[in-house]
Amino acid sequence: MCVYEKIDNPEKLKQYAVKAKPAVEKFSGKFLVRGGKNRTNDGIESPRTVIVQFPDYNTAIECYDSAEYQEAHDILKGHVVRHHQIVEGS
């Protein structure tokens, strides 16, 4: 799950998305929420939220730690403020 607090460079976000999508799909990740209309009820105002479902917790960690995903992640450095969490489902 990724909650964006600030996006300074939308073009870099697009470049990141192009690279991140195949990395996520390689680990059988399924995008459940990817941007779209949202309403903040409590906490920080967020222009974008992304939720990806993986087969299990460890696969999500493997994806995040993979060279492919980290290459995509590097594109965002200095261009966004976001809160990224890997949460085990029930």
Predicted stretch roles:
Residues 1-48, 53-65, 88-90:
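Short S/T/G/P-rich N-terminal loop/turn motif that feeds into the first structured element of a domain
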Residues 60-85:
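C-terminal structural segments of small proteins and small subunits
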